[in-house]
Each structure stands twice: as C-alpha cells, then as structure tokens.
Amino acid sequence: MEENTITKIEAQKKKKDRVNVYIDNEYSFSCNTELIYIHGLKKGKVVDLDYLQDIIEEDNYLYAKSRALSFIEKTFKTEKEIRVKLREKEFNEKIIERVIEFLRKYDFVDDSRYAELYIKERINKQGKVKIKYGLIKKGINDSIIDEKLSKYSANNENYIEAMREVALKKFNNIAKRETDKLKIKRKLSSYLLGRGYSWSEIGEVLKEIFSENN
C-alpha cells in the first residue's frame, strides 16, 4: 500500500459531526465531517501530509469559531474576553485572530458598541472613573472609552442629577446615625469615591447637599 494513504474514515460515537481519519492503518487525526466532503477525503486516497496539516488547522479554526459563538450566545463580550476564553482552550494566536476577524465582520463583537451599552447601564449608579476602570479591565481601548464618556461631562445635567440622587440617598442614610458634619462629609466622600466619582465632582455635589441641609 502506498505511503500516506487513507485507510479508514469512521464516525465518532459521541460526536456525530466528527470523524476519525486513519493513514496507513494508523489513527492520524479527527476533524469535522464537513471537511471530509469539502476536501474529498475518502478511503484509498493518497494524501500529502502538509495538506492534511492544513485540514487540521481549518478544523481547529471551525472548532474555535464554534466555541466563541457559544461564549457570546447569551451576553455581549469584548474582544479581550473572547481572546482570553480561546487561549484557555489552547487555540493558537493565528486561529484566535481569524475568529476575531470573523466575529467583527458579522458584528458579533464590537468594542465600541459594548462600551456604549456598558456606560448606559451604569452611568446612573457609578461615576466615570469607576466606569472607565471597568472598561479598561474588559480590554476596551482608551480612545473608545474617552469618546463614549465624553458626552457625560461635568455640564451634563442627567449625569450630575444621577450623582446627586446617589449622594443624597447615602447622605440621608449616614445622617440617621451620625450628627457630626465633618464625619458625614468624610464618609460620604469615601462612598462617592468608591462609586467612581472624581474629587471635583464630589466637591460640587457635597457643596450643594450641605448648603441645602444646614
């Protein structure tokens, strides 16, 4: 029998969409059934090992793409999150990049859109500092974050009003247990810092709250 001849192709028992391929009576590799038909692989066919390696690479890509699509099925993800997930599955960087390009092409991943939705979901509860930090951890580019946050500047009434509500609610809660204004101010400042508001934003809202509650 000639060298590098396919001697058997058998369906896997547990994964019906995959087959095992034997070369010269020895197991060689497994792949998606679709690739068998695409490349015309069949028993008795003589194959080049480099060509088989290309098929294996293509199979790895299809599997990686399938894993990525499953990962983003229920919730929107960033490119970084998808890359991390695929690296955990030990796919190589070339395949990961191909998957990311596919996801971008069909709008399955869009970091700009992700940042926009992330901000809208949190802007009434958190400050821009915390939101930006959260997006950086998600792998969003600084330029995208700054662009999306720019609309929530210090003169954005909706942003400021949301901060006032957060601050006033906490102020009333602290004031029930504490009468010393300095201690109230310190506790409220610490709380607002933890929520991601800047010192300048905190200073303005504290000035308003304490002037209204003298």
From Swiss-Prot:
Record bears the keyword DNA repair: no
GO CC annotation terms, alphabetical: cytoplasm
Subcellular location(s) of the protein: Cytoplasm
Pfam short name (any one): RecX_HTH2
Keywords tagged on the record: Cytoplasm
Cysteine-cysteine disulfides: none
GO biological process, one term: regulation of DNA repair
Cleavable signal peptide: none
General function of this protein: Modulates RecA activity.
Family the UniProt entry places it in: Belongs to the RecX family.
Name of the featured protein: Regulatory protein RecX
Organism: Clostridium acetobutylicum (strain ATCC 824 / DSM 792 / JCM 1419 / IAM 19013 / LMG 5710 / NBRC 13948 / NRRL B-527 / VKM B-1787 / 2291 / W)
Lineage summary: Bacteria, Bacillati, Bacillota, Clostridia, Eubacteriales
